[in-house]
Amino acid sequence: MAGTLKHVTDDSFEQDVLKNDKPVLVDFWAAWCGPCRQIAPSLEAIAAEYGDKIEIVKLNIDENPGTAAKYGVMSIPTLNVYQGGEVAKTIVGAKPKAAIVRDLEDFIAD
């Protein structure tokens, strides 16, 4: 599945994210959001590099407004890391790949 991140929905969020054994980074995004498109290649690269430690998925807020509202996502891109069914970290705004990796250090370190 290289080059494409899994898409989750309001309906699949609990099973795919909250009940996942691994930490899951959820990219809250929308098709009209330029910065969201800018970080997509970085997220795909991080998924390829660290996929054994963290799962990275995308949630389109226009198609799935319920989950975004539930977690208070007010601006995009917002990256939430869920661990054990809870938000463990929130990253707001577009950042370079290296900065995102630094933010994820607690979840991807050996």
From Swiss-Prot:
GO biological process: cell redox homeostasis
Record Pfam families: Thioredoxin
Domain Thioredoxin positions: 2-109
UniProt KW Electron transport keyword: yes
Keywords: Cytoplasm, Disulfide bond, Electron transport, Redox-active center, Transport
GO terms under cellular component: cytoplasm; cytosol
Disulfide cysteine pairs (residue numbers): C33-C36
Cell compartment(s), UniProt: Cytoplasm
Up-regulation conditions: Expressed from 2 promoters, 1 of which (trxBp1) is under control of SigR, and further transiently induced (about 50-fold) by the thiol-oxidizing agent diamide. Part of the trxB-trxA operon.
Matches recorded under InterPro entries: Thioredoxin, Thioredoxin-like_sf, Thioredoxin_CS, Thioredoxin_domain
GO MF annotation, one: protein-disulfide reductase activity
CDD domains listed in its UniProt record: TRX_family
Presence of the UniProt keyword Phosphoprotein in the record: no
Function of the molecule: Component of the thioredoxin-thioredoxin reductase system. Participates in various redox reactions through the reversible oxidation of its active center dithiol to a disulfide and catalyzes dithiol-disulfide exchange reactions. Stimulates complex formation between sigma factor SigR and its cognate anti-sigma factor RsrA probably by reducing RsrA.
Family assignment from sequence similarity: Belongs to the thioredoxin family.
Name of this protein: Thioredoxin 1
